Each structure stands twice: as structure tokens, then as C-alpha cells.
Amino acid sequence: MNGDAICSALPPIPYHKLADLHYLSRGASGTVSSARHADWRVRVAVKHLHIHTPLLDSERNDILREAEILHKARFSYILPILGICNEPEFLGIVTEYMPNGSLNELLHRKTEYPDIAWPLRFRILHEIALGVNYLHNMNPPLLHHDLKTQNILLDNEFHVKIADFGLSKWRMMSLSQSRSYKSAPEGGTIIYMPPENYEPGQKSRASVKHDIYSYAVIMWEVLSRKQPFEEVTNPLQIMYSVSQGHRPDTSEENLPFDIPHRGLMISLIQSGWAQNPDERPSFLKCLIELEPVLRTFEDITFLEAVIQLKKAKIQSSSSTIHLCDKKMDLSLNIPANHPPQEESCGSSLLSRNTGSPGPSRSLSAPQDKGFLSGAPQDCSSLKAHHCPGNHSWDGIVSVPPGAAFCDRRASSCSLAVISPFLVEKGSERPPIGIAQQWIQSKREAIVSQMTEACLNQSLDALLSRDLIMKEDYELISTKPTRTSKVRQLLDTSDIQGEEFAKVVVQKLKDNKQLGLQPYPEVPVLSKAPPSNFPQNKSL
């Protein structure tokens, strides 16, 4: 099958039809954004590959073949692919948008979803098994090999849609992927990977039993609402422990006695993650065991469970207070002779985790020099996030009950009147650092010479150090051309300060962009996140 034939079999979706792109997540097989299709008038999801260098025709065709496989795999519990965006500088799969995110978010956002009823948990497990069983029964069988809670999406009624199957070429070509510390060296995630796959030479023999091992770990995770091996930070420790036969604990501490059909479920889990692949059951056998369990629940209980989650989600959203056009008093840890002044700001300073407003607490001023300058700032750079991998400002600021909700569309706000302690005389801007000065002096040369690979490495480094906000990353990564991405990166550097600029300079040096010499002398950057951000221990 040639490239033209593949393109004709997949509905083409021009890039300019994808309006309002918004960053959602980043994974091994690319970056996922939401968008609004200009003609269809519906929201869609776009998984696009990070293209650092021009793809060879053979590479592009290999990737398109995988997209074609996804397009053919049409089933109730498989994420539907709507088309392909195949352009020189943008290659992406367009799918249905899943409003309730992933199973990982449902299980581990316990503030947002304090309780998940047992009937719904069992329905989710049953639908995952149905979806993977369908893939295994295709001709030829389609093996997922990256099954994890992050790839199990949930539609508006919390039904399962399995994503990211058959994307080995996408994962291979996405060279800029920012690997989790528990990511496997060849795609997939260590905690969901069977021990025989630690040794590549044995993969072909055991490949059919890979997905059932991952499913067993997911069953444990759904029933316990805990992260497998959450206390272990080194993937080598996990690999050694699993290769010695150790698995997540199934005692009452993790799987309490009130779990319906607990004995049967533990039996399924333990057989699914058996050390010997030949001892693991097929998905068909799992379904035969699960179907009688599902029949013990009345249909109404599933509906009640979904309504309960929707109510919890609404309540959590309503507790996120947006400070907008409302005069407020903030305690800013300032001397008594500098009383706090009033702030009017069109941004959200609270994450969902803060819950209902409580007593006023102190606010530590961010280290961003643009913030301290008193200059008007883009509100998007101040928003708090509640999603895996992002650090919010939980507990830093609380809002009086009188605070008003605001329109998220507000584009800018003035922080010049927050406090004379933060903004001396409201006009003096802190001196620009060496790295920032160098970037400003070399701006057009950087735009001309910075490669796509260097750009993506810079974004990865900024993400790993928590130096870039979600909205800023989104603005950069969704630009249609390399030059527009670089310009946006440099604009963001001007706002975010010296530490941000140092990362960009270091990556330019690492990539030997010799036309930009001489480089400024900046300290060698450590790989650890900055100390003023809390460490994220979740997987």
C-alpha cells in the first residue's frame, strides 16, 4: 500500500480547519490538544507528532499505515479516529473528544471525585476487557502493548474508549518525548509492563500475553484507587522487584474486604500478572468471569453512579474561584507599615484542590521578574492547573466568600497595585539578566537558526523544571510553523525571566548552533526542578 492510497483511505482534515487548539497532555506518541472543527462545529482531539526534522516518505507512510489501522478498528469501546491532518510541518490524528478525560484522572483526582461507586468501577473494567478482546480478535490480531490508565479515556457518560493502540511508529518517531521516570525504554510504562518484556529478545514469544498483564495492574489500580509501586521512584527497582515475582499488595490495606466479589477479582488479578506468560488467561476468559459479576448490579445503579460523578465534578468546578473585577484584601507577609492594597485580576489563583474558601492565608510572591515589575501580565501565565504533571498554587492563597467568578476569556490584568512591598513605586523594573539580554540581542538570528529539535528539547527542559505554564506551552507548540514557534518561545522568555532564558541558551549551545556564537556565560543547569516548586510524586 503506497502513501497516496493511505491518504485517500483516511479522511483528510486540513490544519486550518482545526480552530482554538488547546494543549491537553503530552505523551510518548505525541502531544494531545483539543480543537474545534471549523466545518463540523464540534470539539475534537488532535494527537500530533513532534516533527524535528523533515520525515522521509517511508517514515511518513509507516506512520500513516498505523493511523489507517486505527481507522479500521471501529468498536464501541475503541476511540474513533475521524481523520488525519497530513501536512509538511504538522502530522496529527484527529479523534473524538472525550470530555471526562482519562481513567487515570478519574481514579487519582480524589478531591474532584471523592467516591466512585462499585458498579461503575466494574463496568469500566468490563468495557476495557471488551475493547482489548476486540483488538485481539481482529485479523491479524492488534496488540496494544501500551495499555495503561492514561490511555483509557472516558466519554460523557463515563463509558470506556481505548486509545493509543498500534502506535509503535508514532512513539518511535516522537523523539522529543519527555519520558516519565517510570517510562519504559521502548515505549509503554514500566509499572504496566510484564517482566518478560524487560528482555527484548523474548518479546515475540510472549507478546500475546502482554496486554493481560497490563490489564491485571489496571484492575488492581481501579479497585484500590492507588498508584502501583507509588513508593518506588527508580524504575530499575520496579523492574528488579517484578522480575523476582513481586507485585502490588493485595491485602486488606489496598483491597478492602468490602469490595464486591473480592475473592474472584483477586484471583483474576493474580492470574493476569502471573510470572509465566503461558499461565495468564485470555481476555475472553476474563470476560466469561466478569459477565456474571456485572449482572449482579441493577441497571439503575450504573446511572446513579454516573450522576454522582457528574455532580461531584460540577461541585469541584464551582469551588474554583476566579478573581475578576472584585476588590479583595490579601495578606502578603508584608510589614505592618505597608498595608495590603486591592487587586483586580482576570485570572484564577486557585486550583480545584482548594475546595471551599477558608481563612485568609499568606501569599508568597512568585519569583518571576515580570510579575514583580508591575507591568501588565497575560493572565494565562498566572492560572493554576489541576492536572497530572502540573503544579498548582494549592494552599498558597485563599479567597473571601465574597469573591466573584469571572470570565476565563479575560486576556490581561494589571498587578501594578498589589502592594508597594512587591512593586516599589510601581514603575521600577528589575534589571534584565545576562541570558535574557543575549536572547533579545540575537532574536532574529535565533529565529532563523534554531532547529525544530532544539526547540522541542527546550520545551522538554522547561517542562521538567516547571518553568513554563500550560497555556504558554500550548501557545508555542500549536503554532503552525517552526519560525512562529520560535518567535512565541522568545516572547515567552521575555516575560518569564532569566531562569527561563538560561534554559533556552543552554539548549542552543548543546545543539551547537554555531552561528549564534559567542554565547553568554551562564551557570550549568541542574536537572532537578526548581526548589520553589513542590515535587510531584505521582506517576
From Swiss-Prot:
Modified residue annotations for Phosphotyrosine: Y473
Any GO MF annotation of the entry: protein homodimerization activity
Any single Pfam family the record assigns to this protein: PK_Tyr_Ser-Thr
Compartment list: Cytoplasm; Cell membrane; Endoplasmic reticulum
Binding annotation for ATP: L24, S25, R26, G27, A28, S29, G30, T31, V32, K47
Domain CARD: 431-523
Cross-link Glycyl lysine isopeptide (Lys-Gly) (interchain with G-Cter in ubiquitin), where in sequence: K209, K502, K537
Region called Helix alphaC, residue ranges: 65-73
Residue ranges annotated for the Protein kinase domain, each copy included: 18-294
Renumbered residue ranges of the record's region Disordered: 335-368, 519-539
Compositionally biased residues, Polar residues: 344-365
UniProt-listed GO biological process terms: adaptive immune response; apoptotic process; canonical NF-kappaB signal transduction; CD4-positive, alpha-beta T cell proliferation; cellular response to lipopolysaccharide; cellular response to lipoteichoic acid; cellular response to muramyl dipeptide; cellular response to peptidoglycan
Annotated spans, Activation segment (AS): 167-193
Mechanisms controlling activity: In the inactive state, the helix alphaC is packed against the helical, non-phosphorylated activation segment (AS). Upon activation, helix alphaC is displaced and the phosphorylated AS becomes disordered.
Topological relation to the membrane, as annotated: Peripheral membrane protein
Family affiliation: Belongs to the protein kinase superfamily. TKL Ser/Thr protein kinase family.
Protein name stated in the entry: Receptor-interacting serine/threonine-protein kinase 2
